[in-house]
C-alpha cells in the first residue's frame, strides 16, 4: 500500500531543499556592481607612473584583480560616447546607434549630441537589471561629462549626474526621476571655482618627469577663472576627486549594496590631457592626474570595502580606447603626412557628378570624415544610390592622402573581415553615404566648420579589470574586446545581457 503521507513529506522536503539551494545561489550574486570607465586611460602611462602610486588604488586592482591587459574596441572610430555606450550595451554603434559624441541629423543637416537616453537604440546592462528586478534595483551613473553619464545610465536608471559646462553644478536630465535630494544638496563648483588651484600633489610628482624625455621638470599651477573655467576644470586632475565624493555620497544616500537586490553604479573618470592640449605642453599635469586618480580609486575601494565588503561587490575598470589627437610635427622630421580638405573635396566631387549627370547640388554636406549625398536629387534624376556612391568612391580614391573610401551600400551588404571594425562603427541613420579614410599621419580639415581629425592607426593599449565578487587574481594575456564586459556582468548577477549583445562573457 502506498504511504501518501510519506510521499507528500518527501516532496515537501525535496522542494524545501531546492528552495534553500536556490536561495544560497542567489545570495552569491554581487550586491553591487561598480562599472568604471576611465576616459583615455593608457596602459603605458599606467605603468610609467607606478613608482608614484600607493598600495590601495591601481596596484590593488592590478595585483588582486582579474586583469585582461590587451583590450580593444571592436569598431572604429572610437570616442568617449561611443566607448561608454559600447561597454554599457555590450555591442557596437552599428546596433546601439552611438557613432560618436556628435553626428549629423539627416533631416536638419545640423550636428546633434547624445544628451538623451533616447539616442540609445538598444538596452543597457542597467536597463536589464531594472527589468529583472521589477524596478527594485538602484541604478545611477556619475561622470564629469554629460555623454558618458547618460550612455552608462541608459533608459531605466534612477538618474545620471554630470557637471554642467556653463554653471559648474552637478546636473541631470528630466528624462529620469525627479532630482534626488542628495544630488540637490551636493555642493556645486559655482561659488568655489575661482578659489581652486591645481598644483602637483607632491614635490616628487611636480619636479620629476616619468615620461620618455624624463628628468627634472618645472611644477605647474593652474587657476580656473576664464569663460571656459568649468570645461577646463573637467579635464584637470582635481575633477576625479569630485566624482569620487559624489559616487560615495550616492551609494550612502541610496543604500546601494545594502540588500540582496543587486544595484549598479557607473562611474567615469578622466585621464586625458589637460584642456585637450598637446602632450608636450602638459606632461606633468597628466602625470599628476594619474597619481591623483590612483588616490581616488583607493578612496572609492576602501569605502566600498568598509560599508559593503568587496567580496559582495563586483568592480569593473576599463578605458575608452582612444586619446586626444596630438598635433605631431611630422613634416619637421620628414615623416609622410599631409592635409585633406574635406569641404574642398566635396565641392570637386559635386562638380564631377554634375559633369556626369547635369548640374545640381549632388553633395548636401560633409561632416567629420563623411559625405552626404542629396537623395532627393538623385531620385529625381533616376540615379540609384548605389551608382552615386560607386562613382563618388572611384573619384575620391584618386585624391592625395586618401587610403580608402567606404560606401554605405558596401558597409551594409558586404561581410568582409577586413571591414569589420568600420562596419561595426556604421549606423545608417546617423552616418554619411561615403566615409573617407586618410593615410596615417594625414589630417582631415573642414574649413566650413573649422574642425579637424587626425589619422593614426596605432593601437592604444588599455586593460579590462575585474575585482571583488566572483573573481580571483589572475592575468589573461589573450586579446579581448570590450563588448564582452556587459555579458560578463549580466552572467555574474544572473540577468539577461542587453538586448543587442551577441558577445560571450569573459568568464
Predicted regions located by residue number:
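Active-site nucleophile/metal-coordination loop of metallo-enzymes that catalyze phosphate/sulfate
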Residues: 25-29, 43-134, 145-163
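Loop/turn elements at helix/coil->beta-strand transitions in domains of secreted/extracellular proteins
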Residues: 29-34, 64-68, 95, 134-139, ...
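Beta-strand elements within well-structured catalytic alpha/beta cores of enzymes
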Residues: 30-42, 61, 87, 129, ...
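Secreted, luminal/periplasmic, and some membrane-associated catalytic domains
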Residues: 53, 79, 100-116, 122, ...
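His/Asp/Glu-rich, glycine-adjacent segments
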Residues: 100-261, 270-277, 400
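Substrate-binding rim/cap in mid-to-C-terminal beta-strand-loop elements of soluble/periplasmic
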Residues: 343-385, 451-493, 507
